[in-house]
From Swiss-Prot:
SUPFAM superfamilies: Acyl-CoA N-acyltransferases (Nat), P-loop containing nucleoside triphosphate hydrolases. Catalyzes the formation of N(4)-acetylcytidine (ac(4)C) at the wobble position of tRNA(Met), by using acetyl-CoA as an acetyl donor and ATP (or GTP). It comes from Nitrosococcus halophilus (strain Nc4). One of its GO terms (biological process) is tRNA acetylation. This is tRNA(Met) cytidine acetyltransferase TmcA.
Amino acid sequence: MHPILFPPTLDNIRKITASLVAAAKASGHRRALVLSGDREWCLQAAQVSLASTSLEPVLWIAAQAPENAWRMEAAKAHRSLGQEVDAIVFDAYSGFDLDAFGIITGAIRGGGLLLLLTPPLAAWPSFNDPEHARIVTAPYEVTEVTGRFLKRLVRILREAEGVIIIEQGKILPSVPFAAPARAETGGNPPSPGDSACRTEDQGRAVEAIVKVVTGQRRRPVVLTSDRGRGKSAALGIAAARLLQRGLKHIIVTGPRLDAVEPVFRHAQRLLPQATVSRAALHLPEAGMEFAPPDDLIRTSRPADLLLVDEAATIPTPLLERLLQGYSRIAFATTIHGYEGTGRGFALRFHRVLDEKTRGWKGLRLETPIRWRSGDPLEHFVFRALLLDATAAPDSAVASARPETVAVERLDRDALVRDEATLSELFGLLVLAHYQTRPYDLRHLLDGPNLSVYVMRYRGHVVATALLAAEGGFVEETARGIWEGRTRPHGHLLPESLAAHLGLAQAPRLHCARIMRIAVHPAVQGQGLGTHLVDTIIRETGGEGLDYLGSSFGATVELLRFWERLDFLPVRLSVKRGATSGAHSAIVLHPLSSSGQALVKRARERFLVHLPHQLADPLRELEPQLAAWLLRRGDPAGPLPLDSQDWSDVLAFAFGRRVYEVCIGPIWKLTWGALAAPESATLLGEVERNALIVKVLQKRSWQEAAAALELSGRAQVIEVLRRTLRPLVLHFGNEAVRREAERLAGG
């Protein structure tokens, strides 16, 4: 690019902006203008730039904006979902919020402009960004948050096509000549099948959703797209068409109400007679409403059609339960971007669809609606935020095994310069974790408390783990955490151990939390994850840490993985996560004698609380999960039953007395037996589950029968009796066994 040799006067800035917007309108693309300098200069230059155009509306994402301007704080950027604007002014002086930036840039339509206001580019990486407060954790200061991400961003800005940079006091850039503008800035012509649709893609999507209702049951459709392709609009248009045809009740679900509001907005546009509230649309004898995924699973609300928007942000187990509960479903999700990580969704959920449905249809929306294909702003945002980060090709890593890989702790100064490794690493995190978002990229690069481990095979990343340093508080702060007076940001393990298990010493010890761990899908099940954690245990053991830990949505598979590495479960949240639908588990592994004592005490306290929690807040916990949490590694010693207790158990087990008058001793035997490893060979799954749902969780006979897929009380009692008999013979003393044999023969 050849510079124009004149100073950056406001008049010249005005001319450059006008030329840039003309080029944008001619191409149907969006453009970006970076104004870099002192804050007051940036604000003045932005106003002058906009005054040279007819762009309207203009949205300011900034802490301050001109009088009467439409302004929105970055934290509220999600409210722009589904809206279209001609221009956005994004003030990086107010904080470069990556999540907001990813959201808000998608609202600019073709022919529009992004104005990015920044500190002087050379100094921006060392700028005290307000976003640092989100990244920093005690005992670090905000000044210790590095500028690696911003350094990378500046490099990408300078390399990007369609981005013009004007720096205060420096020579102005040239701007490509603008060809005459064309009126059309959209994608393909509207589908002839539906006048409300703006592209052929969208028309096909609407037809596919309608077919879900009019065709055979249990044949869902899955819509995928990049942002700006009209996916949510297709859901809304299809919903309106179906309601017009007489469908009675549609439920819309998604990660949050604001994420699905575009669905309601597009339906309302075609149903002007409808009464609309924020979470519902009502017609005289029909309507559609929003419900969170966990509510749908808990309450089993009936619906003629379930629309699941941003499905990638919902954990696969929840999606599977929705699939089981509703016979007519349309799923939609974003492949790239802040709304979800669609590639991981495809990997996880398509297998479920293959197993659970009679046949499902996948449909990809390719054509942009708000701008033309090949948009340079979209390309820049994808690259800057790594929205298109991709794990290594399957073929390149398929032969990786523990003995052929190398594990290293990365130098993040080198990582930020190594785009290939960064993309493969972040691509793995995207595949493995449904909640990965752009903020995580900045945290990964700049968080002073983080360590990044990678496992390589022939130069490619096959696994990665992120560790966060936690704990190490002085006595006064530790006591404040234990008493609930303070909750330091970013110290999940010590805070939970102190606040939930009452372990006052926990915040004083030093630990590391394995925040994320991901193994390439092509080599999962080969022991690479175990090898990675084993390496981390060895490396961190000599660094003054007392214990390692992790927190995750509890499943039997994950608990089994951590148990193989000698990580013990010490906590299970009493409520399910609103978005995950899972209870959060904490597992710990000691590294020092102090850590050993803490882990032992934490496990003891957990087992003190667990039996009472199973009978109260955890009554609906999956019995398979409860059984795993109860397990002990060592064989059971004598159980706390006296001779009268054994007599009561025998009386029920052999049909001499009813359950209700023997319940105490039965509970004692159940609790002790299920904690013993030998119970796995003594009991089948149905028998074990019967003890958990009825004896430990104290569900009603009807609830227990439903959980066990039995007809009622009599069948549950029969299962309990046959379950207790082998336990009596195994755990009882010689006298108890003789009495059991007598009753069995009598």
